[in-house]
């Protein structure tokens, strides 16, 4: 386990930390849900029709609740993921609601499991729910608890634009634009790069200069394919090319980043601060995109963002738009919030992206559920 430097600790004020020490974690409820996606998603990694969720509620001794959720790309693993959350909570039950301290405790307690994978996501669920509980207890939204002041977060649409026909992609892009969202991500992984160049060029021709495009290969290319395709995409003015190759091929990703004129984006499949540090030191990408669940929670996400800041790397979020908006509002090197509407029917406090931004409320905690 990577030791956290002092400058990456103490995410909140000493006054708030003192208040947290008097709040005791008492109970947890873990359930699952599989709401349908508003639009099925087809990527180079497969098709997604439902959002497989683990729903977590932690209650303090004084009855304050904190909520979080996890998204599982594979619904069959929901029982295992839910069980891991329950087991991990037993290790901190009865402790103070101090998310940073408790996350470090869990990482140390389970270090023989390697600190990655399902267990890391379990820690994340506890960490995020604990932060929500603390924010609600102190009457503060999380971005203010973390020292942020910006309430309008630049975002891009990621709710769809699956691999499909041009008419399907265009229809969805036009829907996004009708809501004022002209910044959007297109999934790639077509049989040939010629198809991809044609698709993107036609989108730009149809929609004009108003659109800003990112693309995502979802780890779908071989190294040779990635070099070939990134070169072919270089003249299209894309904001970034995301995860063209397997996420653990960080040395090859560094070579690709050096060769590509278009910025390379990765980070959603970095599962620890050690992996983040390695990627940053290698120069594996131009930008960083940690996933708040896979990295181990809000605590670890904010630490990763500080690490990126020292490398002068801009940070975007991956999924989880509700808590990610608070995270993005709290860092100085924020780039774009990934907005996906997958949970809009699950949580009454879900805030939609409009006009290329998500606007935070001043409600306490994360705000998954409106009071």
Question: Can you name each region flagged by the protein language model?
Answer:
Residues 3-13, 23, 33-35, 48-53, ...:
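Flexible C-terminal active-site loop/helix
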Residues 34-42:
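Short Pro/Gly-enriched beta-strand edge/turn motifs at strand-loop
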Residues 56, 63, 126, 139, ...:
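Conserved, mostly hydrophobic/aromatic
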Residues 144-145, 150-260:
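Metal-dependent enolase-superfamily TIM-barrel catalytic cores that perform enediolate-based chemistry
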Residues 248-339:
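Catalytic alpha/beta core domains of metabolic enzymes, predominantly
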């Amino acid at each position: 386990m990577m030791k956290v430097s002092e400058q990456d600790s103490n995410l909140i004020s000493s006054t708030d930390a003192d208040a947290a020490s008097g709040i005791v974690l008492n109970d947890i409820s873990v359930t699952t849900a599989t709401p349908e996606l508003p639009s099925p998603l087809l990527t180079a990694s497969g098709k997604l029709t439902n959002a497989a969720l683990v729903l977590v509620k932690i209650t303090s001794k004084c009855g304050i609740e904190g909520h979080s959720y996890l998204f599982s790309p594979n619904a069959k693993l929901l029982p295992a993921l839910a069980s891991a959350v329950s087991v991990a909570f037993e290790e901190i039950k009865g402790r103070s609601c101090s998310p940073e301290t408790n996350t470090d405790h869990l990482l140390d307690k389970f270090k023989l499991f390697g600190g990655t994978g399902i267990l890391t996501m379990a820690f994340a669920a506890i960490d995020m729910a604990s932060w929500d509980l603390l924010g609600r207890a102190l009457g503060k939204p999380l971005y203010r608890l973390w020292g942020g002041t910006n309430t309008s977060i630049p975002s891009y649409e990621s709710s769809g634009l699956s691999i499909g026909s041009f008419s399907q992609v265009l229809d969805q892009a036009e829907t996004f634009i009708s809501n004022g969202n002209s910044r959007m991500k297109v999934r790639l992984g077509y049989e040939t790069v010629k198809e991809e160049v044609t698709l993107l060029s036609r989108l730009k021709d149809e929609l004009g200069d108003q659109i800003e495009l990112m693309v995502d290969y979802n780890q779908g290319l071989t190294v040779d394919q990635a070099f070939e395709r990134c070169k072919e995409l270089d003249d299209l003015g894309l904001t970034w090319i995301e995860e063209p190759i397997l996420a653990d091929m960080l040395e090859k990703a560094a070579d690709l980043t050096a060769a590509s004129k278009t910025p390379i984006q990765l980070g959603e499949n970095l599962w620890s601060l050690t992996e983040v540090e390695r990627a940053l030191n290698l120069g594996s990408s131009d930008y960083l995109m940690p996933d708040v669940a896979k990295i181990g929670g809000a605590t670890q996400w904010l630490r990763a963002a500080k690490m990126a800041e020292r490398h002068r790397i801009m940070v975007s979020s991956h999924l989880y738009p509700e808590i990610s908006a608070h995270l993005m509002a709290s860092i100085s090197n924020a780039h774009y919030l990934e907005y996906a509407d997958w949970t809009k029917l699950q949580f009454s406090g879900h805030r939609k992206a409009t006009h290329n931004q998500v606007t935070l409320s001043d409600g306490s905690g994360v705000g998954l559920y409106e009071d």
